[in-house]
């Protein structure tokens, strides 16, 4: 799917990057005219912004096939950061003029006549100009996350498609790491050793004793499934959400006893425990922009976040440079849960585990550390590739009442092209759409253009792009796609302590085992009453 980077597209993008907005005729109108050749688009202006929309709409309109099919093509863009705007407008039915929404999850409309069923008109159609179906070009786990299956049925359909493929993990201040002589941790034990070292440093450049910060949006939640799946393996992680226990028994409440969940809770407890001093407990009171700004002003070394940090913070970062803050932010691969050595008998300790991880990062496909078996090497290699994305809750959908359905469908198909993927990356500081496309190798000229303007400050977008090229890389499917989560109310935690904050901040003396047992009790007490109800609601009983 590699294509030459087109001069015409670059012209549009350069104009946008330079601050010039190119509008097609009629785009200045405040309200669409319900003409089937006018595409009114809504974009939720969050982490990836809205700057990618207009150049993509413009380039779409310049396609020869689009000009022939829609000779009177116009577009209009509505943009805001209101959380529920998309859902409320879709609910207006025929009174809504917006033909295409790029919003948050619209899952509540799946299976209804409110949205266009995209199964045949988008997912099973060929990507324009490319010899591949839309569904096949999409990253597998992202596609799987969009599947709609009614409770108790096996049919699959699609009512929405993702418009982002964000990768989450730890963003860290690379400049500070170097100044403090810190090494990026390969394992969770190394993470905590580093945090202990930071507590003892006497450094005027970083005058805090904690290492990790967060925001009021609990980004820490995005690390939980990664550590969990690292330990259990992706298939066992998915089996939890399917209700299949380690013995292969279906509809089994024994899934709540998965050891990987306990091991991850132990990591969380260690991070949150106040006496350890690893975590800035006040940071959870900051809104996301204020919290992320503290990374730029040297008030935290690292933060659970995502590659959207690049785009979200770029303007603020430029302003902070005038105040002397000019550090480089990077994204590290999530440290591997050290307890994985319980499942790799030839890897005897954390030092050996770290050495194996370094070999994997260097591209090795067989162990060089003495005594390590190929089987254990592959277990760690698979764990190193585990990633988590919330892209599946950034969804695009077409209201069934739209008068421009065909036009909206064609635009969604165009978004899968290499050309559209490139436009998106250049206008989101390296963000990516949910397709099998690598900017670095598929559009190297555009990649170099992006890196020349953004790499000095932000490299996490490039980091994530590189990570996804690893043949062992795997994005976990969104847990909300599983019937037990969607219909049965199943989650990562439950009961008396439904969140990490309620467990380890509000109740500072709780242990990971107590939180773990709380979830088991919630689902199994009274002879599995809640669990059986969840199974019935999910159509599994």
Residue ranges with predicted function:
Residues 4-8, 13-114, 120-136, 184, ...:
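Conserved N-terminal structural module of periplasmic/extracytoplasmic solute-binding proteins
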Residues 33, 47, 115-117, 122, ...:
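Mature extracytoplasmic/periplasmic domains
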Residues 65-79, 181-182, 270-286, 323-328:
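A local structural motif
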Residues 80-117, 131-159, 170-171, 192-208, ...:
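Pocket-flanking alpha-helical
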Residues 106-167, 342-383:
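Hinge/lid segment of periplasmic solute-binding proteins
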Residues 146-163, 168, 192-252, 300:
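Extracytoplasmic/periplasmic solute-binding protein
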Residues 153, 428-431, 452-526, 531-533:
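C-terminal capping/gating helix-and-loop segments adjacent to ligand/active sites or protein-protein/ligand interfaces
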Residues 195, 238-284, 327-380:
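Glycine-centered hinge/linker elements that transmit conformational signals in sensory
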């Amino acid at each position: 799917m590699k294509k030459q980077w087109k001069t015409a597209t670059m012209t549009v993008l350069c104009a946008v990057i330079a601050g010039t907005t190119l509008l097609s005729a009629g785009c200045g109108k405040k309200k669409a005219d319900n003409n089937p050749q006018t595409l009114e688009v809504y974009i939720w202006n969050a982490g990836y912004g809205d700057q990618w929309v207009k150049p993509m709409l413009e380039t779409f309109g310049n396609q020869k096939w689009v000009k022939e099919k829609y000779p009177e093509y116009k577009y209009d863009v509505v943009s805001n950061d209101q959380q529920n705007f998309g859902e409320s407008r879709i609910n207006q039915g025929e009174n809504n003029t917006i033909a295409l929404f790029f919003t948050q999850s619209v899952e509540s409309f799946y299976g209804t006549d409110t949205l266009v069923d995209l199964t045949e008109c988008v997912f099973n159609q060929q990507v324009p100009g490319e010899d591949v179906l839309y569904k096949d070009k999409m990253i597998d786990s992202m596609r799987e996350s969009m599947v709609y299956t009614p409770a108790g049925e096996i049919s699959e359909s699609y009512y929405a498609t993702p418009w982002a493929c964000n990768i989450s993990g730890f963003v860290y201040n690379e400049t500070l790491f170097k100044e403090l002589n810190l090494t990026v941790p390969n394992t969770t034990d190394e993470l905590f050793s580093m945090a202990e070292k930071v507590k003892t440093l006497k450094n005027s450049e970083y005058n805090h004793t904690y290492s990790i910060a967060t925001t009021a949006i609990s980004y820490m939640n995005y690390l939980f499934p990664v550590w969990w799946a690292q330990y259990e393996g992706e298939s066992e992680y998915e089996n939890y959400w399917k209700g299949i226990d380690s013995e292969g028994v279906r509809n089994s409440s024994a899934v709540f006893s998965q050891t990987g969940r306990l091991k991850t809770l132990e990591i969380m407890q260690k991070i949150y425990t106040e006496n350890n001093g690893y975590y800035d407990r006040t940071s959870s009171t900051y809104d996301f922009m204020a919290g992320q700004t503290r990374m730029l002003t040297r008030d935290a070394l690292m933060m659970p976040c995502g590659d959207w940090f690049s785009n979200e913070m770029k303007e603020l970062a430029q302003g902070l440079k005038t105040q002397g803050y000019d550090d480089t932010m990077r994204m590290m691969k999530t440290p591997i849960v050290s307890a994985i050595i319980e499942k790799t008998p030839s890897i005897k300790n954390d030092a050996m585990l770290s050495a194996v991880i370094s070999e994997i990062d260097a591209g090795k496909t067989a162990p060089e550390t003495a005594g390590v078996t190929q089987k254990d090497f592959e277990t760690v290699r698979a764990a190193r590739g585990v990633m988590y994305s919330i892209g599946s809750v950034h969804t695009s959908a077409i209201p069934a009442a739209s008068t421009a359905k065909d036009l909206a469908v064609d635009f969604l198909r165009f978004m899968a092209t290499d050309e559209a993927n490139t436009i998106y990356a250049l206008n989101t500081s390296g963000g990516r759409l949910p397709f099998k496309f690598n900017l670095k190798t598929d559009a190297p000229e555009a990649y170099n253009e992006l890196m020349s303007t953004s790499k000095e400050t932000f490299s996490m977008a490039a980091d994530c792009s590189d990570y996804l090229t690893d043949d062992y890389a795997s994005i976990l499917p969104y847990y909300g796609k599983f019937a037990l989560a969607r219909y049965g109310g199943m989650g990562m935690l439950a009961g008396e302590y439904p969140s990490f904050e309620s467990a380890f901040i509000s109740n500072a003396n709780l242990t990971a085992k107590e939180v773990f047992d709380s979830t088991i009790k919630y689902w199994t007490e009274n002879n599995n009453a809640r669990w059986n109800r969840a199974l019935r609601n999910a159509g599994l009983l």
